[in-house]
Regions:
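N-terminal segments that cap or nucleate solenoid repeat domains
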Residues: 2-38
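Glycine-rich hexapeptide-repeat left-handed beta-helix
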Residues: 1-13, 47, 53-55, 61-64, ...
Length: 178
């Protein structure tokens, strides 16, 4: 069972059909939509501001979601994949977005719908990623416009796959002593 904690009178609200890995941590003012999945060692800390997540959001292994005290909440839309080891902090992520493995999205950023942040990228504070763009690098910059192959083949495929993977874990995982 995941570590789920109330803090300062605020408890996480977990959406229906959501998978929580047993080593995931969810604290405080966190609201999730349905069909989400929070994977191993992912941390979602709604301790200093709120975190709102839409439907079909997957937060992959070792990812960190946080906010800035009394300044920047974290809002995440629907059909969003947050890759392994990514950090998403006090920003707004719209619908149909892929945040690549190890990417960092900092305070007060806006990532509009149908966009990709490449693996290992650092999206610096206050950056605005427009709809349909692919960004990468350190600091991140626009690389190209997204096309239908990237949208269907990456953004939607990964989000759909994580709904499928979470069903495997809910139905088939067996604890082995040892």
């Amino acid at each position: 069972m995941a570590l789920i904690k109330e803090l300062l009178g605020k408890s996480p609200q977990i959406g229906e059909n959501t998978f929580l890995a047993e080593t995931a941590t969810i604290i405080g003012d966190v609201t999730m939509g349905k069909d989400c999945s929070i994977w191993y060692n992912a941390v979602i800390r709604g301790d200093v501001h709120y975190i709102k997540m839409g439907n079909k959001v997957n937060v992959q292994d070792n990812a960190m979601l946080h906010c800035t005290y009394q300044k920047h909440p974290l809002n995440i839309g629907n059909n969003v994949s947050i890759g392994h080891n990514a950090i998403v902090h006090g920003c707004t992520i719209k619908d149909n977005v892929l945040i690549g493995m190890g990417a960092i999205v900092m305070d007060d950023c806006l990532v509009e719908e149908n966009s990709i942040i490449g693996a290992g990228s650092v999206v610096t504070q206050g950056t605005h990623v427009k709809s349909g763009e692919v960004w990468g690098g350190v600091p991140a910059r626009k690389i190209k416009d997204i096309n239908s192959q990237l949208l269907e083949g990456e953004v939607n495929r990964i989000a759909d796959n994580y709904v499928k993977y979470s069903s495997w874990y809910k139905e088939n995982v067996k604890h082995i002593e040892g």
